[in-house]
Amino acid sequence: MSVEQASASGAVSDIVEDDKSHLIKGGAFLATVATAGMIAGFGATLAVAKKKSPDWFNKGIIGSAAVPESGASLALRALGWGSLYAWCGVGLLSLTIWKAMGVHSLQEFRQKMQSIFPAIPKNEDAQANSVPFDWNSIFKSK
């Protein structure tokens, strides 16, 4: 093996390492942003509920003799189970599609999806020639 081939194979392995590192960092970033969004949305919802009716909000925090479980703990339990069902459902759906298509890597999946669905035009000329969408036609009364 010559020096040029050795340096070329070293450069290729460096590129692969950089791609893996970039993919991991991107996944961590997306997970962080999604988690922050969920926490912010849940917190904002609680803040609005407390602002609208503080008496009812405080009654829901503490359990009573009539209702042994507080509304807040019931809501948190429902949020937990709903999140679990959503994660498992999306994972199962993704796995089913993956296996049904018979692909073995993300590259194969991408190629298969590109062969099934039409390409999305990236240039502005194609968008300029298309008919603009009219929202008023949808909401117009008959």
From Swiss-Prot:
Main location as per UniProt: mitochondrion
Keywords: Membrane, Mitochondrion, Mitochondrion inner membrane, Transmembrane, Transmembrane helix
GO CC annotations, alphabetized: mitochondrial inner membrane
Transmembrane segments: 28-48, 78-98
Coiled coil (UniProt feature): none
Pfam families given in the database record: DUF1358
Similarity remark: Belongs to the TMEM242 family.
Function: Scaffold protein that participates in the c-ring assembly of mitochondrial ATP synthase (F(1)F(0) ATP synthase or complex V) by facilitating the membrane insertion and oligomer formation of the subunit c/ATP5MC3. Participates in the incorporation of the c-ring into vestigial complexes. Additionally influences the incorporation of subunits MT-ATP6, MT-ATP8, ATP5MJ, and ATP5MK in the ATP synthase.
Name by which UniProt lists this protein: Transmembrane protein 242
